[in-house]
Each structure stands twice: as C-alpha cells, then as structure tokens.
Amino acid sequence: MTHQLRSRDIIALGFMTFALFVGAGNIIFPPMVGLQAGEHVWTAAFGFLITAVGLPVLTVVALAKVGGGVDSLSTPIGKVAGVLLATVCYLAVGPLFATPRTATVSFEVGIAPLTGDSALPLFIYSLVYFAIVILVSLYPGKLLDTVGNFLAPLKIIALVILSVAAIVWPAGSISTATEAYQNAAFSNGFVNGYLTMDTLGAMVFGIVIVNAARSRGVTEARLLTRYTVWAGLMAGVGLTLLYLALFRLGSDSASLVDQSANGAAILHAYVQHTFGGGGSFLLAALIFIACLVTAVGLTCACAEFFAQYVPLSYRTLVFILGGFSMVVSNLGLSQLIQISVPVLTAIYPPCIALVVLSFTRSWWHNSSRVIAPPMFISLLFGILDGIKASAFSDILPSWAQRLPLAEQGLAWLMPTVVMVVLAIIWDRAAGRQVTSSAH
C-alpha cells in the first residue's frame, strides 16, 4: 500500500525547508540592498529574487528528480568528479564555512553587544550553541518533528512579526540610491542574491528534505519527488514574501543608519526604533533561531553524506562535524568571511551550471558531452572570480579584469554560455556520426 503524507505533514515539510534556508545571511542581505538601492529598490529586488529564490528552488526540484543527493545529480560528469564536487560542496557549506558562520553571526548580532566580542564569550557561546546543534542532529528521524513542528514555526512567527512591522511601521522615507544602484540596480541585486550562496545550501538540504519525507513512511519515488517539489515551492513563496518585507525595511531606514551600514546594524537600528528596549532581545532571538535551524540542517546533511564514504557511523560524524565547526567558529566572523568568500565564489558557478543543465539531460545523445565541459569552464572562470574576491587579486592578468561581467563577479557566465553552445553542437554532430555508422 502506498503511504501518502497528511496535509499537516506536507505543511510541516514546507516549513522545515523554509526554515533550513533562512539563515542570518538571508535576513541581513535584503535590508542592505533595500537601503542602498533607494528609489530603485524594486528593480534591485527583482534581480535579488532570481538568484536568492529562483535558483535555490530550482536546485531543490532538480535534486528531487534524482532522489535528493548531489552525488546522483552529478552523474553526467563521472563518479570520481561527482564525488569530488559533492565533497567540496558539503565541506564548504558545512564544517569549513557556513556552519561555523551561523554561530559567529548569531553571536555578534545577539550576544556581543552585551558581552563584547572578545575570545572568551565567543568560546563559551560556541560551546553551548554546538552542543544544541549536535543534540538535535543526532536524531535525524525526528528532524521533521523538531524543526518542522517546533523550531520552524517559532522562527516563522518571529519573521512574520518583523515583516509586518516593516510594512505597518516604516522608520522613515526612501533615500537616494547609491551610485552603484543608480547605474545598475538589477545586476547589483542579482549579485547580492548570488552571494547568499543558497544554491549551495539547497544542494546540501535536498537529501534532508527527502529523508524527512521517508521518515514518515513514504517510499515511492514519485511521491518523494512530488513532496520535495512542494516543499521547495512553499519555501520559495515564504522566502519571496520575507525578502520583499526586508527590502521595504531597509529602504525606509535611511534616517536611522548611514547608507554604508551592514545588514545587522540596519536590523538592530530598526528593531530598537520600533520595539524599544525589547528590540535587542527580539533580534537576538530571531537570529539565534534562524542560525540554529540552518546549522542543524547542514550538520545532518553532511553527516548523511560522509557516512556513505568513510567508515564512521552517522552519530560519530555528527560529533566530529559539530566539534570541528565549533573550533572554526572561534576564528571570528570577519576572518571566517575573508577566507570563505573566495572559495565559495569559485565553486558556486559549476554548481549553478550543473543544476540548470540537469533539466536538459533527456535532450542529448550523451548528457556528459553537454554538461561536463560547461561545468569545467565555469569552474576555471569561477576560480578567477574567487581570486579577484581574495587578497591575491593583484596576481590576476589584465585580461582577466576586462572579462565581460568581471566587475560584477560573474566573469564565468559568458564563457560558460559559449561552451554550452559548443557542447550542444558537438553532441549533435557526434550523435549523427554514431547513428550513421550504425546503418
């Protein structure tokens, strides 16, 4: 007998997916864009939504079609290359960068204003924080109950309060856009959404969503795909509504902060202005819940993935990943971002290429011909973008600085599109040769 999810479980799955996506970066970036974009806020918002909502939802759908794992999604590039890509992806959005960052961001926004940002408070906070992350992550079968039915609703309630306040009680009027947004509001919004790295997160979370449905007794592939797609679409709608409210919050906060302020400062100023003395506590609770849920999802997904390739149990890996993330988090937010941005900028393009081209697999004689070369090119030019975003940008040759869209951090895009066209021509030509030789 085919087991189907109840409506309540489907909604909980959607809540869980939304909650897994919304980390501190998702709450901080939109107000920054809104403040700096000024009168061009909705043009910038459109660009932001394409990369911060459209691409991640597309990734969830792509993963659902192959059963939830990035290793399955990457079969056209070969097993070794696929496992290597998946490993790099999981490490980057797991214990090396994204998971530790959830602790440092929640500390600096919620705790540091009270304790100062010295090493000891951060160490104590990270110890408690990752103890909770490990405890929740040890029971993946209960993830839907813990996150979908408890933590996610708390998180959503806090976000709804903030979003409604931003619309009902604007802090002031819209200021004039900065020079960058006056000249290119759409592309700046597009790049800021790209830098949230949610597509990488989606590649990791896909297997978490599928396994959460499996834990409710769903085994049929068709139903697993359907429920995962529904969860992704529900999360996409939630993200869009949240981002639009946060854009409004940022665009109306020009009277509270300088236009160069970061997202945490904008949120803190707005919440203090609107909610008074309790504002700091509300913001701290919001960021803590957002970061904690994201960290749990990342830890579960990474442990599930590495358990397939190393002779360690899932529970042992949860302890290792949680402990390692705690150690890395004590580098502090600024240093962690400085190290992570170039690496993430380099590995993001081939992941985008893989996700987009995965929907075309059935169109080609040999999907490897069409998918592998563009991924390789996107990685090469993504590395150039990564170097440009690092402290070693001076070593880049002058031609690399003059590439189309290089200023926007998207130098990989045009060469990848050209390679896709060439790969399609190659596939058609090689396919015809095979057909003619068969007669």
Swiss-Prot record:
InterPro entries: Brnchd-chn_aa_trnsp_Livcs
Disulfide bonds: none
Membrane topology listed for this record: Multi-pass membrane protein
An example Gene Ontology biological process: valine transport
Cytoplasmic face of the membrane: 1-9, 67-79, 140-149, 211-226, 299-316, 360-369, 426-439
Sequence ranges on the Periplasmic membrane side: 31-45, 101-118, 171-189, 248-277, 338, 391-404
Spans through the membrane: 10-30, 46-66, 80-100, 119-139, 150-170, 190-210, 227-247, 278-298, 317-337, 339-359, 370-390, 405-425
Superkingdom in the source lineage: Bacteria
GO cellular component: plasma membrane
Molecular-function GO term, any one: L-valine transmembrane transporter activity
Keywords: Amino-acid transport, Cell inner membrane, Cell membrane, Membrane, Transmembrane, Transmembrane helix, Transport
Entry keyword annotation includes Acyltransferase: no
Keyword Membrane: yes
Localisation: Cell inner membrane
Role noted for this protein: Liv-II branched chain amino acid transport system, which transports leucine, valine and isoleucine. Also acts as a low-affinity threonine transporter. This activity has probably minor relevance for normal cellular physiology, but BrnQ may form the main entry point when the threonine concentration in the external environment reaches a toxic level.
UniProt-recorded name of the protein: Branched-chain amino acid permease BrnQ
Gene: brnQ
